Amino acid sequence: MMNLESDEKNLPQKISEDIISFILNEHLQPGDKLPNEAHLAKELNIGRSSLREAMKLLASRNIVTIRQGSGTYVATSPGVIDDPLGFTFISDKNKLVQDLLEVRFLLEPAIAAMSATYADNNDVHKIISLCYEVEELLKHKKDHTQKDIEFHTAIALGSKNLIIPRLVPIINSSIPLFVETTGNVLKTETIETHREIANAIAEHNAIKAQDAMSMHLMYNRRCINSRQK
C-alpha cells in the first residue's frame, strides 16, 4: 500500500533535487539569481507552495539564499553551511582564535596569490569595491564585520579554485572573533593592508598579494597576542 504521508514528506526533497538539477543545467553561478517563483514553478511543473517548501530546504542547506523583496540566489558557497566545523561549540575562544589564525596563515596568503593570478575583471571590481566599503565603515566607526567577511570571500572566489570557496567558513568564522578580540584597534593597519591586498590583486601581482595578506595576518597576530597575555 502506498504511504501517502511518506510521499508527502519526501516531496520537498524531490523538488529540491530538481531545483539543484536546474541550477546545474542552466550553469548558474554563485550569486546568480534564480527565476521568479511563478516562472520556476511552471518550469518544474509544480505548485508554488511546494516550491516554497523546497526552497526553504535548500536555504537550510546553504544551496540558495532567499532575500526578502529581492528574490532567490545561488549561495556564495553552495552546500557549505556557516559553521561546518562546529566552532560555535568550542568553549576556549582564546585558543580558538590562535588556532584559526595559524590556519589562516597557511591558507590565505596562497589564496591571495592565486586570486592575483586568476581573478577576472568582475572579481577585481568586487574586491576593490568591498575594500572601499570596509574602509568607509572603519573610518565612521561602524561595524565592518560583514563587509570584511565579504572582502575575504571575494578574494577566495577570485582564485577560481573549486575547493577554496568551500574553505571560506574557516576564514569567515574567524573574522568576527578577530574583530571582537582586537577591539578595532587595528583600524589603520586594516585599511592599509586591505588596500595593498586589493591593489596587488588588481595588478595581478601574486607575490605582492601574498606578502600583503601575510602582513595583514601578522598585524592581527601581534594584536591578539598582546591582548591575550
Regions found by a protein language model. Give the residues of each.
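C-terminal effector-binding regulatory domain of bacterial HTH transcription factors
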Residues: 1-2, 207-229
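Conserved amphipathic alpha-helical segments that form helical-bundle/coiled-coil interaction surfaces
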Residues: 100-178, 192-194, 208-219
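Solvent-exposed, non-membrane alpha-helical residues enriched in polar/charged side chains
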Residues: 20-25, 156, 198, 214
